[in-house]
């Protein structure tokens, strides 16, 4: 949450968003819902201190998902993306040996998203783009977004996908189910559309990193395959099996269970898994390496891939 964007929003209430202070603590207010703005989201020194505590050498910095701002009018969305991207670039410039930047894009206007992506790659050297699992309910596999995905592919960037809302509303009331169930569900819906739509066949070099261990994707891939074999409707746009397409995705290691992470590694290979933290939020890891060490039968090669190798490859630093 770059300070420049925070200053721009402070006290404003246009489009239902602004930043406010309560007892000296800054909050982001989005149409009446308050979210604390942790110091690590905007203060480089605090970010580095947290990384040191977690034994993280290099971190890719991305915006907090509630601030994708896909619901804003196109011009306002572009302005918000520019503020975020330039703010992240300034953070990275403070400590370029330890921080990398991820772009955020105004996906409500695909043409503007392409222009902004080309700008941040040229001006800031970003190698990654953070996107929501959907854009106000429209899937990333929708044809209207294909040119954005193609530009990401052509520029050699990868996509980091993180939900910002739960598109499936029924049964999600209470117990924070919109997060615990809804976020992984949104991830599997997003991945399924990319697979079955033929988008991944068309975009052969597109790399997509999914948060939270891929949601339910790696654990239900057999069901995807079964449908593709036995139901013609699943083969309308692609003849490529979902299991083959699974290897086109990358995943963070944030599964909250060592046996789940072991299964993920066995399904896709350690070279497609990278450390994830969800920092500084309460659903993340405070000791990601310690969590990794709990994985049964983890080999030194697998550990090296997950700790370093996969991230280096995605960022073009291998």
Give each language-model segment a name.
Residues 196-198, 202-244:
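Aromatic-lined glycan-binding groove of carbohydrate-active enzymes
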Residues 7, 162, 212:
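Histidine-centered divalent metal-coordination motifs
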Residues 57-191:
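Active-site gating/metal-coordination segments in enzymes
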Residues 5-58, 86-94, 115-119, 206, ...:
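Mid-to-C-terminal alpha-helical segments outside catalytic/metal-binding sites
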Residues 5-39, 166-185, 224-246:
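Active-site gating loops and adjacent loop-to-helix segments of metal-dependent hydrolytic enzymes
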